[in-house]
């Protein structure tokens, strides 16, 4: 009887011991990371200048896009996805000044704490909203080809609105704990690394969210490749069947089909290759200091590429959305040319224009 009671007590203590061991491992890795000083010269001098250019360009392009989309009704799934993409890009753009001032050390150290707890979290949240929306845009173009005449539920505006709301709420709720769990006291020393503001639970949640976001990216990436292989085949077959001799226009229209994949791959793929080893280095006590700094620079470089997405998405609006192009002030005088190109190949237009 005594042995049974002793066994029961040992089992009840086991989960607590396991949790403490897990937390100890995480904190050991974090403490080693904290002792490794970062070489911030590039981050402090070069990237703020580059981000400033991206911010000014992005605010100009997205403000213009906002003005145009205000005058376009949300009458199709394609337009709804584009409008949500624009909102995500605008929010990302508005988060950049905080990063610029913080990284350049032009603002007090308290701003860095704000960046770690709020603006950086919002930036990443809206970035992944944009990634999923680019996947939905590719899916919408895919459906337009395989079901061009069928009025299925997936092509109705109510579906696009519902799935867009779900995406925003899902990413908001998994991102919110990253703000709440950055609850350690901020000091001039601790804000140099955002991980310093997190406890063991915060670091584990950060890892989990990173894994979820990696899963989101690679799922969207693979599906997008599948969609555009089908689209490429359709475009090729369309050109073969049409006996048009205007090869120049054919090449332009073919290029438009792949603008989503190009933007997606150039902006987001490098960051996701660099993100996994960087996050691992922050909680692994075996990563040496030099490698940590190299991974940090790689992460910051690829993060800059991801931020350029706010300037690249307007290319999607221009190349793929006919209604957007027609509303642009600089395109008003080109309606006649656009109409002649529209009549050139109706099937290709159905693929590329929304």
From Swiss-Prot:
<feature type="disulfide bond">
    <location>
        <begin position="116"/>
        <end position="194"/>
    </location>
</feature>
<feature type="transmembrane region" description="Helical; Name=1">
    <location>
        <begin position="50"/>
        <end position="70"/>
    </location>
</feature>
<feature type="topological domain" description="Cytoplasmic">
    <location>
        <begin position="139"/>
        <end position="161"/>
    </location>
</feature>
<dbReference type="InterPro" id="IPR017452">
    <property type="entry name" value="GPCR_Rhodpsn_7TM"/>
</dbReference>
<comment type="similarity">
    <text>Belongs to the G-protein coupled receptor 1 family.</text>
</comment>
<dbReference type="GO" id="GO:0005886">
    <property type="term" value="C:plasma membrane"/>
</dbReference>
<keyword id="KW-0812">Transmembrane</keyword>
<feature type="topological domain" description="Extracellular">
    <location>
        <begin position="183"/>
        <end position="211"/>
    </location>
</feature>
<feature type="topological domain" description="Extracellular">
    <location>
        <begin position="274"/>
        <end position="300"/>
    </location>
</feature>
<keyword id="KW-1133">Transmembrane helix</keyword>
<feature type="transmembrane region" description="Helical; Name=7">
    <location>
        <begin position="301"/>
        <end position="321"/>
    </location>
</feature>
<keyword id="KW-0675">Receptor</keyword>
<dbReference type="GO" id="GO:0007186">
    <property type="term" value="P:G protein-coupled receptor signaling pathway"/>
</dbReference>
<feature type="transmembrane region" description="Helical; Name=2">
    <location>
        <begin position="78"/>
        <end position="98"/>
    </location>
</feature>
<dbReference type="GO" id="GO:0045028">
    <property type="term" value="F:G protein-coupled purinergic nucleotide receptor activity"/>
</dbReference>
<feature type="transmembrane region" description="Helical; Name=5">
    <location>
        <begin position="212"/>
        <end position="232"/>
    </location>
</feature>
<feature type="glycosylation site" description="N-linked (GlcNAc...) asparagine">
    <location>
        <position position="31"/>
    </location>
</feature>
<feature type="transmembrane region" description="Helical; Name=3">
    <location>
        <begin position="118"/>
        <end position="138"/>
    </location>
</feature>
<dbReference type="InterPro" id="IPR008109">
    <property type="entry name" value="P2Y13_rcpt"/>
</dbReference>
<feature type="topological domain" description="Cytoplasmic">
    <location>
        <begin position="322"/>
        <end position="333"/>
    </location>
</feature>
<feature type="topological domain" description="Extracellular">
    <location>
        <begin position="99"/>
        <end position="117"/>
    </location>
</feature>
<keyword id="KW-1003">Cell membrane</keyword>
<dbReference type="InterPro" id="IPR000276">
    <property type="entry name" value="GPCR_Rhodpsn"/>
</dbReference>
<keyword id="KW-0807">Transducer</keyword>
<keyword id="KW-1015">Disulfide bond</keyword>
<feature type="glycosylation site" description="N-linked (GlcNAc...) asparagine">
    <location>
        <position position="23"/>
    </location>
</feature>
<feature type="topological domain" description="Cytoplasmic">
    <location>
        <begin position="71"/>
        <end position="77"/>
    </location>
</feature>
<feature type="region of interest" description="Disordered">
    <location>
        <begin position="335"/>
        <end position="354"/>
    </location>
</feature>
<keyword id="KW-0472">Membrane</keyword>
<keyword id="KW-0325">Glycoprotein</keyword>
<keyword id="KW-0297">G-protein coupled receptor</keyword>
<feature type="topological domain" description="Extracellular">
    <location>
        <begin position="1"/>
        <end position="49"/>
    </location>
</feature>
<dbReference type="Pfam" id="PF00001">
    <property type="entry name" value="7tm_1"/>
</dbReference>
<feature type="glycosylation site" description="N-linked (GlcNAc...) asparagine">
    <location>
        <position position="285"/>
    </location>
</feature>
<protein>
    <recommendedName>
        <fullName>P2Y purinoceptor 13</fullName>
    </recommendedName>
</protein>
<feature type="topological domain" description="Cytoplasmic">
    <location>
        <begin position="233"/>
        <end position="252"/>
    </location>
</feature>
<dbReference type="GO" id="GO:0005783">
    <property type="term" value="C:endoplasmic reticulum"/>
</dbReference>
<feature type="transmembrane region" description="Helical; Name=6">
    <location>
        <begin position="253"/>
        <end position="273"/>
    </location>
</feature>
<feature type="transmembrane region" description="Helical; Name=4">
    <location>
        <begin position="162"/>
        <end position="182"/>
    </location>
</feature>
<comment type="function">
    <text>Receptor for ADP. Coupled to G(i)-proteins. May play a role in hematopoiesis and the immune system.</text>
</comment>
């Amino acid at each position: 009887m005594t042995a049974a009671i002793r066994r029961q007590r040992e089992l009840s203590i086991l989960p607590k011991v396991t949790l403490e061991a897990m937390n100890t491992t995480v904190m050991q890795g974090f403490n080693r990371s904290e002792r490794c000083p970062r070489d911030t010269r590039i981050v402090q001098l070069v990237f703020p200048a580059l981000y400033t250019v991206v911010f000014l360009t992005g605010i100009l392009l997205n403000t213009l896009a906002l003005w145009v989309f205000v005058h376009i009704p949300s009458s199709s799934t394609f337009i709804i996805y584009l409008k949500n993409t624009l909102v995500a890009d605008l929010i990302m753009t508005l988060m950049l000044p905080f990063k610029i001032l913080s990284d350049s050390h032009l603002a007090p150290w308290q701003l860095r704490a704000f960046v770690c707890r709020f603006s950086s979290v919002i930036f990443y949240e809206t970035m992944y909203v944009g990634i999923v929306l680019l996947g939905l845009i590719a899916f919408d173009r895919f459906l337009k080809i395989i079901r061009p005449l069928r009025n299925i539920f997936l092509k109705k505006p109510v579906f696009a609105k519902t799935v867009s709301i779900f995406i925003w709420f899902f990413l908001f709720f998994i991102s919110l704990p990253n703000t709440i769990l950055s609850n350690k006291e901020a000091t001039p020393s601790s804000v140099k690394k955002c991980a310093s503001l997190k406890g063991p639970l915060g670091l584990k949640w950060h890892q989990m969210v990173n894994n979820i976001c990696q899963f989101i990216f690679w799922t969207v990436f693979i599906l997008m490749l599948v969609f555009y292989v089908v689209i490429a085949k359709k475009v090729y077959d369309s050109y073969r069947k049409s006996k048009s001799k205007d090869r120049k226009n054919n090449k332009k229209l073919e290029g438009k089909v792949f603008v989503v994949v190009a933007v997606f791959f150039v902006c987001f793929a490098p960051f996701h290759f660099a993100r996994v080893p960087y996050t691992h280095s922050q909680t692994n006590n075996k990563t040496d200091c030099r490698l940590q700094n190299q991974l940090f620079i790689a992460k910051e470089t690829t993060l800059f590429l991801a931020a350029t997405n706010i300037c690249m998405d307007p290319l999607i609006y221009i190349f793929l959305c006919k209604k957007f192009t027609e509303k642009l002030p600089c395109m008003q005088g080109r309606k006649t040319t656009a109409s002649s190109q529209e009549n050139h190949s109706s099937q290709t237009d159905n693929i590329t224009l929304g």
